[in-house]
Amino acid sequence: MVSIKSVLAAATAVSSALAAPFDFVPRDNSTALQARQVTPNAEGWHNGYFYSWWSDGGGQVQYTNLEGSRYQVRWRNTGNFVGGKGWNPGTGRTINYGGYFNPQGNGYLAVYGWTRNPLVEYYVIESYGTYNPGSQAQYKGTFYTDGDQYDIFVSTRYNQPSIDGTRTFQQYWSIRKNKRVGGSVNMQNHFNAWQQHGMPLGQHYYQIVATEGYQSSGESDIYVQTH
């Protein structure tokens, strides 16, 4: 999948509201993003959880913050998008998550975040659709945590959108061998494994359990929590 960047320095408004492509009504009208063909880019806090949402505007994609730590994404013939709920800043916390993830084509379900100094975009891939992102990245090693094997990869993005504008930066990947949609992710174990393979992190920005898609359709309904 083409990497999908979160350009999230500020919420970006869509010029006009359009009819919702899905029969999909926000559960919390005071805080949920309005139903539109493409949900406007945004980040902030909702019911005590940090959320982040970005789309390139292609296709039809709807992100909605639901009650508590839940969110939902529905997409059809979309371009690039990534979004979800979690925390800011990121830490080595153990994350519990669950729900539903059904991509028809390219899609990821991942713990997703960024650091600065160095600028790093990272993924712990728990499930994916038709494309394994490790196929175009450099393999660094394998380790075992949370009941399964994870393969570690690194890749470099040149002059691409980031949380700090257009920059060159590295992407770190842990990809679970056996896909799942629900369980615990010990982020400190991933951070330690990356460090052991010469992949240092910097100052943490946000850390979310994200749904990501590229030129695909599908839906997800995910909740997050910590121990």
Swiss-Prot record:
Keyword Signal assigned: yes
Coiled coil: none
Biological-process GO terms, alphabetical: xylan catabolic process
GO MF annotation, one: endo-1,4-beta-xylanase activity
Pathway membership, UniProt: Glycan degradation; xylan degradation
Glycosylation sites noted in the Swiss-Prot or TrEMBL record: 29
Superkingdom of the organism of origin: Eukaryota
Catalytically driven reaction(s): Endohydrolysis of (1->4)-beta-D-xylosidic linkages in xylans
Gene3D superfamilies (UniProt xref): 2.60.120.180
Entry function: Endo-1,4-beta-xylanase involved in the hydrolysis of xylan, a major structural heterogeneous polysaccharide found in plant biomass representing the second most abundant polysaccharide in the biosphere, after cellulose.
Name listed for the protein in its UniProt record: Endo-1,4-beta-xylanase 2
Gene name for this UniProt entry: xyn2
